[in-house]
Amino acid sequence: MNKIFLIIYFQISLITQAQLYFPPVNSNTWDTISPLQLSWCDNKIDSLFQFLDSTDSKAFILLKDGKIVLEKYFNGHDISSDWYWASAGKTLTAFMIGIAQQENFLSITDTSSSYLGSGWTNCTSSQEEAITIWHQLTMTTGLNDNVNDPSCTEDTCLNFLSSPGTRWAYHNAPYNLIDQVIENTVGLSLNWYMHQKLKTPTGMNGLFLNLGNDDVYFSTARSMARFGLLMLNGGNWGGNNQIMTDTSFFNASINSSQNINPAYGYLWWLNGKTQLMLPSSQLQFNGKLNTNAPDDLYVALGKNGQSLNVVPSQNMVWLRMGESPYNMPVLANFNNEIWSYINELNCNALNINSGDLSNIKFHPNPVENFLSVKGNFSEHFNYSIYNQLGKKIDSGILTNKIDLSAIKTGLHIVEISNQKQDKLFKILKN
């Protein structure tokens, strides 16, 4: 195959992959992609929707390249209905801390008492002074979370347990105080600051409401989708509005913030890590957060199955809002179940007919080690794999599985051919 052609093909592929659609700010208009364009099967989509309906969902949206592929509402919910984000809304607060830092109102390395005042905890002065905004963002304040109400922000509820940065615990109370940090340094409430800096430029709606000791965000599903799209594009809206200019903060927020729980960033949950910890536990578990999801997934998770999933390798965002699916608080496991249905959307059962490559299907993509090939190989086909420089790095006779374990990570081209024809496919090796 011509090397120059392959390199040009790669460049076009990368440009195409990078293009994102952004819906108008002051409109309900939102471009769509037909599932048929993605080779998604109606019966698989029906199975996904049936599962969501059976688990008391209210809303589900899936974006590809910024456009809506799937949008479904259940149980009386509709496009204009607001619903709570629960702890998924923590990611909004993290984003606003990043905005406050880029505007020089604060630094996340500042001690929290600089903005909350001395005596905001029941610790000694030296213990309290050691707690920073960064510790609040990463759930590593060292304050005792084993209290009657983990959301209580009274000083008597905030007691020393370990030095900041040495213990990870999912503790709502220190997080809840971040809105006071913003208000005391910016001079605006979190809601008003968000309205100016986030909601207006992206077209989001919504509001943080105080429910007991917790501030809970309510919005439409499409507003949650807008935030996911903003995150997918690195804090940039529409290509010419870089809302989050502090790229260091942005990148840190969606990567491991510490090594105690590497599956946690700045209030975002991270997939693809070798270990993780979960709320209400000090146990470290081996393995990924969501085994059915791509490794580069980062996700906002909230009580009763609220979730916002962002997958850069697939230019995909999807969300679920709803009631508790199993009459109990859930986080990662339910999200993983939804991923199992999403992975089945592609019509992989289609065969490769004799002399016809139009229906060949690869999965998973992105892939780690083994690439499965779906089809009925009634003729002899060969495969060749090329890197981004157009160099052939592997080849062989096509079977139902290709071993990619020895191939470096990155974007590659797979060529399937016989004496009659050939076809190119993009794959991403993780």
Spell out what each predicted region is.
Residues Q19-T32, N346-H363, N376:
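Residue-level detector of functionally pivotal "anchor" positions at catalytic/ligand-binding pockets or at interdomain
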Residues E103-T141, L188-T220:
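Active-site helix/loop module of the DD-peptidase/beta-lactamase fold
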Residues G66, W83-T109, Q136, I178-I182, ...:
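Active-site SXXK
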Residues G355-N430:
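C-terminal outer-membrane/trafficking sorting elements
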Residues S162, G203-P312, P325-M328:
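Penicillin-binding protein/beta-lactamase superfamily catalytic region
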Residues L48-H77, L308-N309, N315-L319:
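A short, well-structured edge-of-sheet supersecondary motif
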Residues L297-A349:
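Structured C-terminal helix/loop/strand segments within mature extracytoplasmic catalytic/sensor domains
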Residues I79-S80, G142-F218:
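Catalytic-site signature segments of enzymes, centered on catalytic residues
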